[in-house]
């Protein structure tokens, strides 16, 4: 591991996974602009379901299923009392492991697919995380919604999915 932050995050996830359950590699990223390469710790939490994160010098990028989140403080520093990027990333990961994550895919017409994610709390309320639009090329227009829910299975040490 290059960064101590990686160990800090793994310690926070220890109720769910141990270091033996994950794959950790040091990554070197060559940048297109010719500047010095960036180095990161890549930690694969659930390879089958594309759940992993990478820690850089001042940023954490978290990938989950078909989406991802960036956590950093260089765009805007946290105000007094606000959590820093490490705390925000750790909180997100802990919620990913303890709450259900709902994925809603909506096809409208023949050329657009919208994908949205939301954390679902025990009381049924949800926190919208964001969404993306993808270009598709269907021959026939259609209106379709597919909802699936992801939840961490502690016994199997991986995420499982159910489609509604």
Segments from the language model and where they lie:
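Acidic, proline/glycine-rich low-complexity IDRs
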Residues: 94, 98-164
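Long, charged/polar, surface-exposed segments that mediate recognition or autoinhibition
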Residues: 65-104
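Amphipathic alpha-helical segments
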Residues: 2-23
